[in-house]
């Protein structure tokens, strides 16, 4: 049994090292003019960049958007430590307290509602700094995104039958 375990560990390490060597050979540096990948933070956030794609914003508009987003960021708060601990306590308790969990969820829903309201207000402020032509393009982009169905993450594309 010891030999089998040793063989397994040795082969795992060897394959892991081979994968690392292969990964090091195939990595390429990003082009100098490439846009950084936008996960959750960036110029305007994950979806704001798409929201303003092809609008040809002026520098003044970009600055106004930055200021609006900075104000929004200051308002958006992470759930308080007590709420996160309360949620953790519910999850890790020996028995599930449904009443306590529902009360915690209600609290979290209130906070989410307030955050969504602030988010929509921010988007409205940004929309209202656009020129009429930019608003027209913005609405066209919105309609285009509604009709284009994005591929489901992590799922295989449907095969044609």
From Swiss-Prot:
The keyword Transit peptide does not apply. Belongs to the CpxP/Spy family. Keywords: Chaperone, Periplasm, Signal, Stress response. This is Periplasmic chaperone Spy. InterPro entries: Cpx_auxiliary_protein, LTXXQ. Gene3D superfamilies: 1.20.120.1490. Residues 140-161 are annotated as: Disordered. It is found in: Periplasm. The lineage of its organism: Bacteria, Pseudomonadati, Pseudomonadota, Gammaproteobacteria, Enterobacterales. One of its GO terms (molecular function) is unfolded protein binding. Its main location: periplasm.
């Amino acid at each position: 049994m010891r030999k089998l375990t040793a063989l397994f560990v040795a082969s795992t390490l060897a394959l892991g090292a081979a994968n690392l060597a292969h990964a090091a050979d195939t990595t390429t540096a990003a082009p100098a003019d490439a846009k950084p990948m936008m996960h959750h933070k960036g110029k305007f956030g994950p979806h704001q960049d798409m929201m303003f794609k092809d609008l040809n914003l002026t520098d003044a508009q970009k600055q106004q958007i930055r200021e609006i987003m900075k104000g929004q960021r200051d308002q958006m708060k992470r759930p308080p430590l007590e709420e996160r601990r309360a949620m953790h306590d519910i999850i890790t308790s020996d028995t599930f307290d449904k009443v306590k969990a529902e009360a915690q969820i209600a609290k979290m829903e209130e906070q989410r509602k307030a955050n969504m309201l602030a988010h929509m207000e921010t988007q409205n402020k940004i929309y209202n700094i656009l020129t009429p032509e930019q608003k027209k393009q913005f609405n066209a982009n919105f309609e285009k995104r509604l009709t284009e169905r994005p591929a489901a993450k992590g799922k295989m594309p449907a095969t044609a039958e």
